[in-house]
């Protein structure tokens, strides 16, 4: 008999971290820690995850595919050329067809509204593997990494430096829910979305944490326990690259900036990283960096999530 983390997630979707309670997140992080120690748990015999990718990926594809295999199931990779979505089939029809073939859908796409529609029309759970607005699986891995290194989440100060993007939105909401104080420094015109900021501030009031938004990276990293960076130009923004590099230059995480953080700060980055753009090689390859521990943790939190969504708690013999 395999143990099952108690969450409210069985059979449900994960579109943003707003879908999870503090108790759910704590349970998922505990389960992820267990799965990190005992990687192979063949509980998913006969279960299949459909993985829809409209944006390319290394970590998302490999971690979900390996995770399903380690849990005894299988994963189907579906690119745009494998589906009829790009040739006029509706999201609703795709959702209904896949619901008859597989047990869950993970989708990595551009428009968040597409994930919402897929979840509405599907009869099976849908997991957001990334949209332009949110990246909840990454934030779960971030929280696990912070907890592993700092030993706690409540009271930890996290500073995010750079574009107010999907990663920033999910990190901000996750930190606010779990009691981390988060400061986000972004240039004017590149701030986080109001809807994400307002949600995070509401959660922070409940958890006793704080959310600070600024355009000053030094202010953001002052006495920080964790410094987090992401690329200045995300997929789909290539036409803006030169403009962005100029605007974001003062937001590079380098030795001068991290000197304002705590001496034992931890550097995180969701990867892929562009060394000497958003972060210097000295920092990302230095002793305070935990980016590869963070990347590995994508596997473990996603396995915990899949187990919570798809596994009732039968013995592996009957699963």
UniProtKB/Swiss-Prot annotation:
GO molecular function, one term: amino acid binding
Pathway connected to this protein: Amino-acid biosynthesis; L-arginine biosynthesis; L-arginine from L-ornithine and carbamoyl phosphate: step 1/3
Catalytic activity: carbamoyl phosphate + L-ornithine = L-citrulline + phosphate + H(+)
Tagged with keyword Amino-acid biosynthesis: yes
Subcellular locations according to the entry: Cytoplasm
Pfam family, one: OTCace_N
Binding-site positions, L-ornithine: 166, 230, 234-235
Database matches in PANTHER family: ORNITHINE CARBAMOYLTRANSFERASE, MITOCHONDRIAL, ORNITHINE TRANSCARBAMYLASE, MITOCHONDRIAL
Protein task: Reversibly catalyzes the transfer of the carbamoyl group from carbamoyl phosphate (CP) to the N(epsilon) atom of ornithine (ORN) to produce L-citrulline.
The name this protein goes by in its record: Ornithine carbamoyltransferase
Species for this entry: Bacillus subtilis (strain 168)
